[in-house]
Amino acid sequence: MHTKMLKGASMGAKRKIEIRKVSRLGIWITLFLALAFVFLIIQGENEFFAMNESTEQYIQGEKAAQQLEKGADYLTEQVRMYVMTGDTSYMDAYFVEANQVKSRENALDTFKIYFDRTASFSALKAALDTSLELMTTEYCAMRLVCEANDVLPSSWPDEIKAAELSKEDEELSDDEKIKKAQHLVTEESYQEMKDIIAEEVTNCEAKLIRQTRHYQEKAMTIFSSMYSKLQIGIVLMV
C-alpha cells in the first residue's frame, strides 16, 4: 500500500510539472501573439496615415496644377486687354504677375515637393515651358502697342525693351501695329499653344489620379492583409 501511495504521489508530481510546462508555453504563446498584435496595429496605423498623406498630397498637387493654369490664363487675359484698350495698367498687372507673384513657377515648385521625378511632374513642367515660350509673342504684341501709343520707352519693362520686332513690323503705321498686336494674341497659332498648356495640365491631373490611386490601392491591400492576420491571431488566442 505504501508503494501505491508513492506511485500516486509521483504521478501527481509529473502531472503538475506537465501542467506548469503547458502553462508556461501558453504564456509564451500569448506574449508572442500580443507582441505580434502590437506590431500589426502600429504597422496598420502607419499605412493608414500614409494613405491619408497620399490623399493630402493629391489635393495639394491638384491645387498646384490648377494654379499654374490660372496663372497662364491670367497673363493671356492681361496682354489681350492691353492690346485691345491700350491701358498700361493691364501691362503693369501682367508684369506684376510674371515677375513678382509668379503663380506658375510657385505652383510647379509646390508640385515638385510631392511629385518630383514623376510623369505628372513632367507634364506640368511641359505646361509651364509652353507658357514661358508664349511670352515671347506676348512681349512683341505689347511692344507694338507701346510704340503705336507713344508710350515713353523709359517706362517700358525690360522685357518689352528687349523684344525685337521685324523690319516689316517697325515700318507699320500706328493703327497697323495695334491690329498686328491684337492678331498675335488671338490668332490660331497662339490659341494652339494655349490649348497645349491646358492639355498638359489635364494630362498632369490624369497621371496624378492614377499615381495616387495606385498608392492607395497598395496601402489598402497591405492594410487588409494585416487585418486578416489580426483576426487569425484572435482566433488562435481564443
Regions found by a protein language model. Name each.
Residues 12-16, 42-55, 145-148, 156, ...:
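Juxtamembrane amphipathic/coiled-coil helical coupling segments that flank
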Residues 23-74, 114-130, 222, 226:
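Amphipathic alpha-helical segments and their boundaries
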Residues 6-15, 81, 140-144, 238:
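Juxtamembrane segments at transmembrane-helix boundaries
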Residues 20-26, 39, 81, 196, ...:
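Seven-transmembrane-like multi-pass membrane architecture, highlighting hydrophobic TM helices
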Residues 1-31, 224-227:
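Positive-inside N-terminal membrane-insertion signal
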Residues 88-184, 188:
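Heptad-repeat alpha-helical coiled-coil/4-helix-bundle sensor or tether segments in soluble regions
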Residues 228-238:
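Selective detector of the "anchor" transmembrane alpha-helix that sits immediately C-terminal
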Residues 57-83, 101-105, 124-127, 131-134, ...:
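N-terminal alpha-helical signal peptides/signal-anchor transmembrane segments
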